[in-house]
């Protein structure tokens, strides 16, 4: 189990993930992990103020669109938007919680570049566990660059076979982290 937020939470990660805080400064409300493998995944866990469920989608969809805005994404599509069951975040069973999940893709320019030809398609998986008693959304996102996908796919089934293993790895990673996430010290929300 990997300690998060000074040990206030912990979660299980697949092998080969590096804590990005050893490379650069990370905001206090975030934990960022980079994968050292061919999939090149990034996992971000954020503690954010709880938002009310939007009328036009899930809390996870709201955060997906917020990520698209932060990424200055030129295109975005949501493939799946669903609720999470208690089994999906079983490490939080002792907490009053709800969850939602989004899978999608964004076309993102490389940082500092404005040339649309330098844009990359990134599959983005977002799971949100809302801790009602603490008015907090725990936002878990996995970013998976799709190097062989030339346009934003309208569905996960339209991703080329050469990028399917990346999508599978991203899905397995977010499920593993979300399912294993445990709140150890509730004072993190004080």
UniProtKB/Swiss-Prot annotation:
Short name of any one Pfam family annotated for the protein: Mog1
A GO molecular-function annotation: guanyl-nucleotide exchange factor activity
Subcellular location: Nucleus
Disulfide bonds: none
Annotated GO CC locations: cytoplasm; cytosol; nucleus
Presence of the UniProt keyword Hydrolase in the record: no
UniProt keyword terms in alphabetical order: Cell cycle, Cell division, Mitosis, mRNA transport, Nucleus, Protein transport, Transport
Homology family: Belongs to the MOG1 family.
Protein name per UniProt: Nuclear import protein mog1
Organism: Schizosaccharomyces pombe (strain 972 / ATCC 24843) (Fission yeast)
Taxonomic lineage of the native organism: Eukaryota, Fungi, Dikarya, Ascomycota, Taphrinomycotina
